[in-house]
Amino acid sequence: MPQSSPSTAATASDMDKNSGSNSSSASSGSSKGQQPPRSASAGPAGESKPKSDGKNSNGSKRYNRKREPSYPKNENFSNQSRRSNSQKSKTFNKTPPQRGGGSSKPFSSSSNGGRRDEVAEAQRAEFSPAQFSGPKKINLNHLLNFTFEPRGQAGHFEGSGHGSWGKRNKWGHKPFNKELFLQANCQFVVSEDQDYTANFADPDTLVNWDFVEQVRICSHEVPSCPICLYPPTAAKITRCGHIFCWACILHYLSLSERTWSKCPICYSSVHKKDLKSVVATESRQYVVGDTITMQLMKREKGVLVALPKSKWMNVDHPISLGDEQHSQYSKLLLASKEQVLHRVVLEEKVALEQQLAEEKHTPESCFIEAALQEVKIREEALSGVAGGRAEVTGVVTALEQLVLMAPLAKESAFQPRKGVLEYLSAFDEEAAQVCSLDPPGPLALPLVEEEEAVSEPEACEDLIADDSLGEGTVCAELSQEEPIAKPGFTQLSSSPCYYFYQAEDGQHMFLHPVNVRCLVREYGSLEQSPEKISATVVEIAGYSMSEDVRQRHRYLSHLPLTCEFSICELALQPPVVSKETLEMFSDDIEKRKRQRQKKAREERRRERRIELEENKRQGRYPEVHIPLENLQQFPAFNSYTCSSDSALGPTSTEGHGALSLSPLSRSPGSHADFLLTPLSPTASQGSPSFCVGSLEEDSPFLSFAQMLRVGKAKADGWPKAAPKKDDNSLAPPAPVDSDGESDNSDRVPVPSFQNSFSQAIEAAFMKLDTPATSDPLSDRGGRKRKRQKQKLLFSTSVVHTK
C-alpha cells in the first residue's frame, strides 16, 4: 500500500502538467484508497484545495470530477461522454440500478474499470451518433434505408465495382480530349515504313504522333498565327491543335529556360520535337439557300474508307499520298521518304527563304535562320535514308510483286471448281451436274450485283434509325408501301455495303433521311439512285460523333469519335424525283418546314429578349409605340368632291361624298364640334374646287392661299355627314404575337388587352350615339312609339348628353 501512493501521486502530477489543473480525487485516492467513495469525496476535500489554488481556486467538485478519467484504468478518456462522467458524482440520482458490489469505487480494480467503460459504451449506443456532433444537421438517412448517389455517378459496375468511367457515366458526359479531337477531324500524312493495321481496323485508334509527317486541316477560313496575327509561314501545329509560324513558335520557346513551354492559347505543354508541319485548306461553308452537289458513296462493312460509287475500288490498306483521286476520302495517307522530302520539306524551305529575304534586317531573322537549320537537318536525314534505300527499292518491289502474284495464281487455279456442283438434294438419288467448267467472269458479275443489292434493306434500317436526327416519320412506312420492281433489287437479310450521299468536295455533309426515303421510293434503292444530285439547301444540322450516334447510324461508323459532321436537307425537285413521290412525302416535308419556322421564331424572340435585357442594363428602354391605324381614335379627313355647278348642302353632299366624321364628332353634344370650321357655300361656288386631303394624300391641311380665298365667310350650318360606316374600322387586327411576330402555325395568340378594351369602349359609344330606329308596326297603327330606355354600359367622367 505505501508503494501505490507515490505512483498515484506521480500520475496526478503528470495530469497537472498536461491539463493545467489538479484533481482533488487524486489526492483522496492516494491517501484513502480503501475508503468508500462517499467518505473520500467528503473528507479530504480540504487537502486538495491548496493544490488547485494556482489555476482553479474555487475547487469545484463537479470540475474535479470531470478530470477524473486521468487514471490508468480509464484508457478511453477521449471517447467518453459527459453523460457517463457525470454519473460518478454523489449528487447524481439516476445511476444504473445494479452496479455490482465494488463497482461504486472509481478505480478499485481493473475489472471494475473495464465494467465502467462497458456501461458508458452501452449508453452511447442507445443514442444516434448525430446527437453528439454538436449543433449540426442530423442525417437520418440510415433510418429510411435510403442512399443518395450524385448525378452522373450512378451506373452499372463491372465485377468488383471497378468498371471503366465511361460505362458508369450514364449521362454520357466524357472529358474532352484535345488530341482525340485533333485526330478525329484532321488528315495525316504518315511514313509508309510503319504498321497501321490497328488504325485501319478501328477508327478511334490514335495515330502515333512520331510517325506523322504532315497534318492537313480542312476549315472554312484560313487560320492565323496567334502570336503575329498573320497567316502562318511554314506553319507548325502542336499536339493540342494550335497553329503557329515556325519562327514565332521558336521565338516563344526560346524565352523559357526549360526544354518545353506552355501553349500561349491553352497552356498545354509544347515541346520542340512535337511540332509537325501543317497545311490548312479552305473549303466552302454552305448555308441555307445555297446549291450543293452530293455524290453517291459506297463503303464495305469493316472498312473505314468510303469512296464514290463511280470511283470505287477494294481498299485493304491506307491510300497513298500520290493518289489524288481517292486521297480526300482517307484519314491516313502513306508517304515515302521521297514524297515527304519533295512535298513537305522543300515547300517549307522555300517559304522560309522567302520570309528571310523580306525580314532579313529584323530581330526575327535569327529565328528564321534557326528554322532553316532545322529544315536542313531534316532534309539531310531524309536524303540519306532515301539514298541508302534506292539500291534496295527495285529488289523489294520485285519481291512484293512475286508475293502478290503467287496467291492470285493459286486462286485462279481453284476458282472454277467452286460453282460446279450443287448440294445433294434430300429427294434425289443422283448428283446433277449443273454446269461445266465455265470462266469465272460471267459468274462474278451477278454476285457483285447481288451483294450491292443486298445492301438496300439494311440501308433502309439505317435510314429508319437516322430519322431520329432528322425528326422525320418512322421508316416502317416503306415496308407497307408498294415495292417498285427494279432489276437486280432483291430483299435479303444481310448487306456487305453501305450507300449514302456525301458532299462532292469531301466535307462531312450527308443527306437527310427524308430525302433518302424519297430517292429510295423513286429509284427502288440507293444503289440505283443517281451518282450525283444537286439541289438547294433547306436545313443544315451539325452533330458530333458519339457512341449513341454510331449505334443509330451504322453507315457512319467509319467516322471516329468527336468527329464533326452535318446532316443536310435538300429541296429535291421533279428532275430528281417525281411529283408523285413529293406528294407522298409532303406531310413529312411540311412538318419539318413548320418546325423550322417555329424554331426560327423562338430564336428571334430569344434574341429580342436578350437585346432588351442588355439595353436595360445600359439604361436604354424601348420607345412607346402608339398605333395610328385606328381611325376611331385618330379620325382622318376625307376629301371634298366639289363641282362648279353644285353648292355645299345637304342634297349635294349625299351624292358626292362629304366630310366623314367620327361618331364622336357627329353627336350633338360632342366635344369635337369646336375643332372643325364649316366652309361657306357661296365661297365654294365662286372659288375653285379644293380638296382637304386624307392620310393617303400629300397635303392634309388647307394652304394659305385657300384660306385667303375663303375669307371670313362662314356657313350657318354644318354639312350633313355621309352616313357611311366603315365596317373595317372596328375589325380586329390580324393575329399577332405579344412580341410582334405573326404566327402562321396552329397556335392562336392571346389578343392584346389594350386593343380589345379600347375597341369595346368605342363600340359602346357608337351604340349610344346612334339614334334608335322607329318600329314600322308602331308607325302603321298611328300609336306613339315608346321611348326606349337606355342601358348604362360604362361610366366615365365624360358627360354625354342627348
From Swiss-Prot:
Q: Which residues cross the membrane?
A: none
Q: Which domain of life is it from?
A: Eukaryota
Q: What Enzyme Commission number does this protein have?
A: 2.3.2.27
Q: Which residues form a coiled coil?
A: none
Compartment list:
Cytoplasm; Nucleus
Q: Zinc finger (RING-type) residue ranges?
A: 225-267
Positions modified as Phosphoserine? 5, 110, 128
Answer whether the UniProt record assigns the keyword Phosphoprotein to this protein: yes
* Gene Ontology cellular component terms for the protein in this record: cytoplasm; cytosolic ribosome; extrinsic component of postsynaptic density membrane; glutamatergic synapse; nucleus
UniProt GO MF annotations: transcription cis-regulatory region binding; ubiquitin protein ligase activity; zinc ion binding
Q: Supply the alphabetized keyword list.
A: Cytoplasm, DNA-binding, Metal-binding, Nucleus, Phosphoprotein, Transcription, Transcription regulation, Transferase, Ubl conjugation pathway, Zinc, Zinc-finger
- Low complexity bias (residue ranges): 1-31, 78-90, 104-113
**What are the start and end residues of every segment in region (Disordered)?**
1-134, 645-664, 716-753, 767-802
GO BP term, example = positive regulation of myelination
**Coarse class of the protein's main subcellular location:** cytoplasm
Q: In which pathway does it act?
A: Protein modification; protein ubiquitination
Compositional bias segments (type: Basic and acidic residues): 114-124, 716-728
The record's listing under SMART domains reads:
RING
In this chain, composition skew of type Polar residues spans: 645-654, 793-802
* Gene3D superfamilies with a match to the protein in the record: Zinc/RING finger domain, C3HC4 (zinc finger) (3.30.40.10)
Task: Provide the reaction this enzyme catalyses.
Answer: S-ubiquitinyl-[E2 ubiquitin-conjugating enzyme]-L-cysteine + [acceptor protein]-L-lysine = [E2 ubiquitin-conjugating enzyme]-L-cysteine + N(6)-ubiquitinyl-[acceptor protein]-L-lysine
UniProt-listed InterPro entries: MAG2/RNF10 (IPR039739), Znf_C3HC4_RING-type (IPR018957), Znf_RING (IPR001841), Znf_RING/FYVE/PHD (IPR013083), Znf_RING_CS (IPR017907)
Function of this protein?
E3 ubiquitin-protein ligase that catalyzes monoubiquitination of 40S ribosomal proteins RPS2/us5 and RPS3/us3 in response to ribosome stalling. Part of a ribosome quality control that takes place when ribosomes have stalled during translation initiation (iRQC): RNF10 acts by mediating monoubiquitination of RPS2/us5 and RPS3/us3, promoting their degradation by the proteasome. Also promotes ubiquitination of 40S ribosomal proteins in response to ribosome stalling during translation elongation. The action of RNF10 in iRQC is counteracted by USP10.
The record's similarity note reads:
Belongs to the RNF10 family.
Return the protein name. Answer: E3 ubiquitin-protein ligase RNF10
Instruction: Look up and give the organism this protein is from.
Output: Rattus norvegicus (Rat)
> Which classification does the entry list for the species?
Eukaryota, Metazoa, Chordata, Craniata, Vertebrata
Q: Which gene encodes it?
A: Rnf10
